[in-house]
């Protein structure tokens, strides 16, 4: 579950940065 949470968090952060 932690792995999925990290993947979503990274995706959101990457989208925000872009």
From Swiss-Prot:
Induction: Expressed at low levels in exponential phase in rich medium (at protein level). This is Protein YtiB.
